[in-house]
């Protein structure tokens, strides 16, 4: 099982403590059974990151901070959503969109309508749906 071996090696290298685990109480849309993830960085993937499930090596998502393409993205998230994660004015919130890489750069998209919100200080997150944002679940990245 080559995938499992790579998963184990990557997790051991990147996961230095339980403090690095982001807990999603409700899981992600379509993946409600998976609650604990680690956000992995790799220079060869930049500006993307990998959100890897700790419950299954087969569940991982390529993610991107939406501000790379939409400067005002954080303003689109209702304050109550940040507050539900314990984000305050002193806390730096993080948001990510799940990315799908297409056959060409023009075919690559991000789900800007259903971002992942993270309170990195408390290591908790949730996925929400922005119904009135005007953004798409398949927002072109290029």
Predicted regions and their residues:
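Extended catalytic/binding region for NAD+/ADP-ribose chemistry, centered on the ART fold
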Residues: 73-77
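Long, compositionally biased stretches
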Residues: 2-71, 90-142
């Amino acid at each position: 099982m080559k995938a499992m071996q790579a998963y184990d090696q990557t997790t051991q290298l990147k996961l230095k403590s339980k403090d690095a685990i982001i807990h999603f109480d409700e899981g992600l849309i379509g993946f409600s059974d998976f609650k604990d993830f680690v956000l992995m960085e790799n220079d060869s993937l930049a500006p993307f990151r990998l959100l890897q499930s700790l419950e299954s090596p087969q569940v991982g998502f390529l993610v991107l901070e939406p501000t790379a393409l939409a400067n005002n993205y954080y303003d689109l998230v209702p304050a109550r959503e940040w507050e539900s994660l314990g984000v305050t004015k002193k806390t730096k919130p993080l948001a990510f969109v799940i990315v799908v890489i297409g056959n060409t750069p023009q075919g690559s998209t991000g789900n800007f309508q259903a971002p992942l919100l993270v309170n990195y200080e408390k290591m908790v997150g949730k996925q929400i749906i922005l119904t009135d944002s005007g953004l798409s679940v398949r927002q072109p990245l290029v």
